[in-house]
UniProtKB/Swiss-Prot annotation:
Residues 1-339 are annotated as: A. Homodimer. This is Chaperone protein HtpG. HAMAP family: HSP90. The keyword Transcription regulation does not apply. The lineage of its organism: Bacteria, Pseudomonadati, Pseudomonadota, Gammaproteobacteria, Enterobacterales. Pfam families: HATPase_c_3, HSP90. Residues 556-627 are annotated as: C. Keywords: ATP-binding, Chaperone, Cytoplasm, Nucleotide-binding, Stress response. The keyword Lipid biosynthesis does not apply. It is found in: Cytoplasm. InterPro entries: HATPase_C_sf, Heat_shock_protein_90_CS, HSP90_C, Hsp90_fam, Hsp90_N, Ribosomal_Su5_D2-typ_SF. GO terms for molecular function: ATP binding; ATP hydrolysis activity; ATP-dependent protein folding chaperone; unfolded protein binding. Residues 340-555 are annotated as: B.
Length: 627
């Protein structure tokens, strides 16, 4: 070979190469993705330059990438008939770590040309990923438009230097041969290579072909070599929505999600302007088995100009939308040099915000257009969506529109009522959205806190899932109306009761000494004792003050193993109930104490579902019943 010389890399050489090869990439098979991406770039460069210089094609305009293996020599070769490189370009692009010929090419192009390009290899470490699986890499290349004797040979063992020489190469383009390390024979296997290409390069517009040998049927005959196209899947998301059928969208969803059922809905959009990207987002019909596994990553597939970069790119979707499947394809995304971890930047955040709004709009449309499908969605993913009000304050109102509830108006635990439905049915003079949280639907439905609301025909949301209390601590209002827990102390609730008549006033006045006796007996165990007119069938209830931690929130703390502050209840008494009147007539202090304790335990049991000493409660009840 003529002009042979050995040169040192123009960077931090051996140390940097070693760091990159062994640490930069988390998945060694992506070397093939990187090399095919580089080949795709080379084809794009030739296509652009041939627009003004068609003779660069030299009669070979069918651009492609070819992959072949040699099991005897233990080599894997990736070749293309793209733009190729001159000697200076080889030194410049392959002799410098983190130097990208693609990036330089982009900078030399006009903005309109950049917009239409499909260049993907914008980071100069991609080529060197070959050393993850190879202990020696050789490159044979010839620039388009150059003579056959102007080919270039490059070789390196990834040890800090490389050899370069002049060669004769009959055709343009680049041929990269990897001499595989011991233990990397899997990349000599035809099926393994095919699967990697299908996984990472399925949607490159450039054909990716693999060598296929057919044995001769004649004895002693030579086998024939042909090239089989591997990347059969189309870049569906680059096509116009009007050109894609529902069946194609459904099949593509199954392809990228490995799901067997059709999605409930999808949204396909191309955005142009300051940021340009295409998104294709799907709402699955059922929850994945690992949706609640916090260690499992959830997110969109990330493509850069149709080349797969990573699964589960979490940066583009908030956690409460982790059920969304799909992809985003852009050339403007900020990536670190390995393309493995997206940089935390304004561009990424803007994309996240836009995609989040897109999903919320898609769900809103699904709810309006197909209530049955939306109910399927809610049954599968409602619990996840309920994380939204706490996680995403900027979209809280939009998320609230998507929530569904069981209510006192329906005799079913099915969560089918929207907040818009609730507001449309509010009675005259009602200015709050009332709700109750409990351990179960049955407990919520039968709570004594609902007695006044049933009497007045006021609908109450029945919340019975563990996340509900936490969600409601962030969901403070909807459509200008505040939320009010019916288990919290609220002066306006008594105003909902009938105006006190003279008889009620007299009854309350007569029982005022009773209230004082109860206060004296219970002391610091309760925050206050007072009458209420929101009860009809129940003698007493306990409520928490407006600024006090609720019973359900205290249970959440306890379930999480955290120490919650002790809840001090307000003990509210129904002055018109027979048991209250009977207790008030008891003069014996010991018996009076038993009555008060029984009434308090009943109220606590209704509120909390448990008592500190249920056996004492039973003995006390039996004693009073047998008296």
């Amino acid at each position: 070979m003529k002009g042979q010389e050995t040169r040192g890399f123009q960077s931090e050489v051996k140390q940097l190469l070693h760091l990159m090869i062994h640490s930069l990439y988390s998945n060694k098979e992506i070397f093939l993705r990187e090399l095919i991406s580089n080949a795709s770039d080379a084809a794009d460069k030739l296509r652009f330059r041939a627009l003004s210089t068609p003779e660069l094609y030299a009669g070979d305009g069918d651009l492609r990438v070819r992959v072949s293996t040699d099991k005897e020599k233990r080599t894997l070769t990736i070749s293309d008939n793209g733009i190729g490189m001159s000697r200076d370009e080889v030194i410049d692009n392959l002799g410098t770590i983190a130097k990208s010929g693609t990036k330089s090419f982009l900078e030399s192009m006009g903005s309109d040309q950049v917009k239409d390009s499909q260049l993907i290899g914008q980071f100069g470490v991609g080529f060197y990923s070959a050393f993850i699986v190879a202990d020696k890499v050789t490159v044979r290349t010839r620039a388009a438009g150059a003579n056959a004797d102007q080919g270039v040979y490059w070789e390196s063992a990834g040890e800090g230097d490389y050899t370069i020489a002049d060669i004769t190469k009959d055709d343009r383009g680049t041929e990269i041969t990897l001499h595989l390390r011991e233990g990397e024979d899997e990349f000599l296997d035809d099926w393994r290579v095919r699967s990697v290409i299908s996984k990472y390069s399925d949607h490159i517009a450039l054909p990716v072909e693999i060598e296929s040998q057919t044995e001769s049927e004649e004895e002693g005959g030579e086998s024939t070599v042909s090239w089989e196209k591997i990347n059969k899947a189309q870049a569906l998301w680059t096509r116009s929505k009007s050109e894609v059928s529902d069946d194609e969208y459904n099949e593509f969803y199954k392809h990228i999600s490995h799901d067997f059922t059709d999605p409930l809905s999808w949204s396909h959009n191309r955005v142009e302007g300051k940021q340009e990207y295409t998104s294709l987002l799907y709402i699955p019909a059922h929850a994945p088995w690992d949706m609640w596994n916090r260690d499992h990553k959830h997110g969109l597939k990330l493509y850069v100009q149709r080349v797969f970069i990573m699964d589960d790119a979490e940066q583009f979707m908030p956690n409460y939308l982790r059920f969304v499947r799909g992809l985003i394809d852009s050339n403007d995304l900020p990536l670190n040099v390995s393309r493995e971890i997206l940089q935390d930047s304004r561009v990424t955040q803007n994309l996240r915000n836009a995609l989040t709004k897109r999903v919320l709009q898609m769900l809103d449309k699904l709810a309006k257009d197909d209530a049955e499908k939306y109910q399927t969605f809610w049954q599968q993913f409602g619990l996840v969506l309920k994380e939204g009000p706490a996680e995403d304050g900027s979209n809280r109102e939009a998320i609230a529109k998507l929530l569904r509830f069981a209510t006192t108006q329906s005799d079913s635990s099915a969560q089918t009522v929207s907040l818009e439905d609730y507001v449309s049915r509010m009675v005259e003079g009602q200015d709050k959205i009332y709700y109750i949280t409990a351990d179960s639907y049955a407990a919520a439905k039968s709570s004594p806190h609902l007695e006044l609301f049933r009497k007045k025909g006021i609908e109450v949301l029945l919340l019975s899932e563990r996340i509900d209390e936490w969600m409601m601590s962030y969901l403070t209002e909807f459509d200008g109306k505040s939320f009010q827990s019916v288990s919290k102390a609220d002066d306006t609730l008594d105003k909902l009761a009938d105006e006190e008549n003279d008889a009620q006033k007299e009854a309350q006045k007569a029982l005022e000494p009773f209230v004082e006796r109860v206060k004296t007996l219970l002391g610091e165990r309760v925050k206050d004792v007072r009458f209420t007119y929101r009860l009809t069938d129940t003698p007493a209830i306990v409520v928490t003050d407006a600024d006090e931690m609720s019973t359900q929130m205290a249970k959440l703390f306890a379930a999480a193993g955290q120490q919650a502050p002790e809840v001090k209840y307000i003990f509210e008494l129904n002055p018109e109930h027979a048991l209250i009147k009977r207790a008030a007539d008891v003069s014996d202090e010991a018996e009076f104490g038993e009555w008060v304790e029984l009434l308090l335990d009943q109220a606590l049991l209704a509120e909390r579902g448990t008592l500190d000493d249920p056996n004492l409660f039973i003995r006390r009840m039996n004693q009073l019943l047998s008296a």
